[in-house]
A protein has these predicted regions:
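Helix-turn-helix
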Residues: 44-80
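Hydrophobic alpha-helical segments that form the core
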Residues: 5, 10, 14, 119-122, ...
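An amphipathic alpha-helix adjacent to DNA-recognition modules
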Residues: 31-42, 46, 74-98, 117
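Basic, helix-initiating cap at the start of DNA-binding domains
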Residues: 1-51, 59
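Secondary-structure edge/capping motif, primarily at the C-terminal ends of alpha-helices
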Residues: 97-105, 131-137, 187-194
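Amphipathic alpha-helical packing segments from all-alpha helical-bundle domains
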Residues: 94-95, 118, 140-165, 173-177, ...
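Short secondary-structure transition hinges
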Residues: 110-111, 125-155
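Hydrophobic alpha-helical connector segments
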Residues: 84, 98-124
Length: 219
């Protein structure tokens, strides 16, 4: 007898996991306080770096302009603020990534590779992403969320390739996950010393992914 899927298994990653909030703000004023804290933290990360945020709670508190009580009502620590920032970044990216996939013509499977590479390159041009992901300034919580996010994206990429059936009938979610992990590492490499991304590395990433998926295409 087949095992029934649980409701939890059907949820996307950000519905199964939380960010860094101690509790969800309910009132409009509370939501404004949370947004104020997150905006200040993002600015501080970009201006002074990851270490400045987690190394001095006072520095972050001064930048936010909110009271200590209001801050700790929603966040246990500066690290949890960054957890929430990263959580929202990944959640927003998941939505816009899906929009990019949905907008493709669907005539050639190579379009999927182009969307992947172009999307990752554009994401890494964001200062916050470069400071946190490229420099690997991620908490253990965010690393776990990142794995969930990549697995989710792998499923979305597989769905796109399945539209070219039967050509990619042998392609699996694991294959797509491997490709995404490789692309993430190459994007980090491309943006380590170049805020616009080293075009040669980006081109090689495109070539590698094209050849990788071509190797999994049926005759």
């Amino acid at each position: 007898m087949p095992r029934s899927r649980s409701r939890t298994a059907d949820l996307v990653w950000y519905e199964r996991a939380d960010g860094g909030l101690r509790k969800q703000p309910v009132q409009e004023r509370s939501r404004a306080v949370v947004e104020q804290i997150l905006e200040a933290a993002a600015e501080l990360v970009q201006d002074s770096g990851f270490e400045a945020v987690i190394g001095s709670p006072t520095l972050l508190l001064d930048r936010t302009g909110v009271s200590r009580g209001s801050f700790y009502a929603f966040f246990e620590s500066p690290e949890h603020v960054l957890d929430e920032l990263c959580y929202r970044q990944m959640k927003d990216s998941t939505a816009t990534f899906q929009q990019a996939l949905d907008a493709r013509r669907g005539r050639r499977w190579n379009e999927i590779v182009d969307i992947l590479v172009d999307y990752y390159a554009e994401e890494h041009r964001t200062p916050l992403v470069r400071e946190l992901w490229v420099r690997q300034n991620l908490t253990q919580r965010v690393r776990a969320l990142d794995e969930l996010c990549i697995d989710d994206w792998a499923g979305r990429v597989l769905d796109q390739f399945r539209r070219h059936a039967p050509k990619f009938d042998g392609l699996t979610r694991l294959h797509c996950s491997v490709a995404l992990h490789a692309l993430e590492r190459l994007a980090q490499f491309a943006f380590t010393d170049d805020e616009d991304g080293d075009p040669a590395v980006i081109d090689q990433a495109r070539l590698m992914l094209t050849q990788f998926f071509a190797a999994h295409a049926g005759k």
